[in-house]
Amino acid sequence: MRDIMGMMGKVKEMQSKMEKVQQEIAALEIEGRAGGGLVTVILNGKGEMRGLKIDPSLFKEDEVEILEDLIVAAHKDAKEKGEAQAQEKMADLTAGLPLPPGMKLPF
């Protein structure tokens, strides 16, 4: 019976830590860049876009496709960085847990 109570206590502690880490992740601000910094996308930890910076030199009618590609690339860069930071924070939390390889938390 003590084992079950101890396990329940650990589960509650883990839930509390998980909530804290999720809040930390949500508060992250991640910048993705493309075109050598000509385009910058800013995402929060949830992957929501919070900002976009475009160098004025890209505002040329004949370079619209280039600008579109750079925006997509900068967004992808920011998203990948955010996912990596989130995985790093979660790895610290789940260290020692027998989770299957490649399993992403939170679910």
Curated annotation (Swiss-Prot):
One of its GO terms (cellular component) is bacterial nucleoid. Residues 81-107 are annotated as: Disordered. Keywords: Cytoplasm, DNA-binding. Gene3D superfamilies: Nucleoid-associated protein YbaB-like domain. It is found in: Cytoplasm, Nucleoid. GO terms for molecular function: DNA binding. Residues 98-107 have a biased composition (Pro residues). Binds to DNA and alters its conformation. May be involved in regulation of gene expression, nucleoid organization and DNA protection. Homodimer. PANTHER family: NUCLEOID-ASSOCIATED PROTEIN YBAB. Belongs to the YbaB/EbfC family. This is Nucleoid-associated protein Atu0095. The lineage of its organism: Bacteria, Pseudomonadati, Pseudomonadota, Alphaproteobacteria, Hyphomicrobiales.
